[in-house]
Amino acid sequence: MKLAILSRQPDSYSTMRLHLAALDRGHEVDVLDTLRFAIDLAGDGPDMAHRSQPIEDYDAIIPRIGASITYFGTAVVRQFEQMDIYTPNTANGIANSRDKLRAIQIMSRHEIGIPATAFARNRDDVLPAIERVGGAPVVIKLLEGTQGIGVILAPDTRVASAIIETLQSAKQNVLIQAFVEESRGRDVRALVVGDRVVGAMRRTAAGDEFRSNVHRGGTVEAVDLDEEYEATAVRAAQIMGLRVAGVDMLEGTDGPLVMEVNSSPGLEGIEEATGLDIAGEVVDFVDNQVAFPELDVRQRLSVSTGYGVAEMLVREDGLWVGQTIGESGLLDRDISVLTLHRGAQVIPNPRGQRMLEANDRLLCFGRLEEMRDMIPDRRRRRSKVRPLPIDPESGRPVDDEIEV
C-alpha cells in the first residue's frame, strides 16, 4: 500500500508512530504537510499538487488535521475523496467532530447519551438555557477547541452569565452544558478503529483541575470497558462519519455520556497507558479498507430519475410486524432494503427471510412514489423545558441567585 499521512507536525509522537507502523508492515509512506497542497479543479476531473509538484498515486491517506486549519484541511481531504483515494475519516466527519455544536446535534438526533446542552445567543435566553440544563454549576465551552482549551466551569449562575456575556461580546459562540458531578475531574477515552474499540484509558485531572486532558497535567490508566461503553463509543464515531476516533465519555450515573468525538486523537497517552500498538491497528485497518473508498451513496443512488433513498418505520400497529421482509411486499414493489436498524443494532443487507419487529427502521432504495406513503411521520418534539418563574414587574425570568 502506498500511504500518505497528512500532518503539519512530522515529528509529533502520533505522526511518527503511524509512519513507523506503516514502514514496519512493508508499506510505502510519505508524510505530507497539509498546508502545502494546491487543489486543481477542471471539467476533466479533480487533481492536486503538493509543493507545486503533481501528487503521486496514493492508495490511501491518514489525515491528521489540526483545529487551526480545519477549513483548508477538510478541503484537501475532500479532494482526495473525489479522486477515489481512501481515507478512514471523511471531510464531513472531520468537520462534524470539530464543531462541538454540530457534533452534539448529530448525537442527540441519534439518541446517544450526552450531557444536557443548550446553545443560546440572545442575552435574554441565557438564564433559561442554564436552567434547562439543570442549573449551576455549568460547563461553558467554545464551539472549537482541543486539549481542554476554551472549557470553563462556572460555579454559579451569576458567574456563568458573566462569562457567557464576555465571550459573546468577543464574538464567540458558546455551549452551556450540564456539569456531571459524579464524573468530576475524570473521563474515559476510547480509541475506535473501524467497528471496535482497540484501547481505552481513564484520564484523571491533576489537583483541583476539572479538565482531565493529558495536556493539562492529567494522569492516565488503562481501563476495560463494558459492552455499553464500547457500543456507545463505536456508534458515536460511526454516526459522526469517522472510522478512527477518540471518543471521550463521562461516567454518568445512568451510563456513558459522550462529551466529544476527536477526529485526530493523540496516540501517546493511550499507547503508554495500555501498552498496545494503536498506530499499528490504524494502519492495518486502512490497509484492509483501501479498496473501498468512501462513496456518497445517497447522491449516487438519486441520479436515477424518480428513485432515491428513504427510511421506513415498522409501526407497532402495522401489518409488517411479525412478517419477513419477503412477506412485506417491498421486493414486489421494487424496493430494496439496504440496512435494518433495530435499536442500536444495524443489520446490513438483510435477507428476505429476516423477521420484522415493531419500531424497526428500514433504509430502502426504490421508486420515491412507491415509498411515499411508507415514510414515518416527522418525530414530534419532546419538550423538556423547565420554565423559570416570571417576575410580575419586569416580565423577565427570575433566578434565585440573580438580583432582578
Predicted regions and their residues:
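Phosphate-binding site of ATP-dependent enzymes
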Residues: 151-236, 240
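Active-site nucleotide/adenylate-binding loops and adjacent lid/helix of ATP-dependent enzymes
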Residues: 1-23, 29-31, 40-41, 49-56, ...
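Short, compositionally biased
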Residues: 82, 352-354, 371-398, 404
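A short, gly/pro- and small-residue-rich
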Residues: 67-89, 377-384
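ATP-dependent carboxylate activation and anion-phosphoryl transfer catalytic cores
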Residues: 1, 224-298, 302
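Long, charged amphipathic helices and adjacent flexible linkers at domain junctions
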Residues: 293-314, 384-399
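Glycine-rich, highly charged phosphate/nucleotide-binding loops
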Residues: 36-57, 67-73
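Cytosolic Rossmann-like ligand/nucleotide-binding regulatory domains
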Residues: 316-378
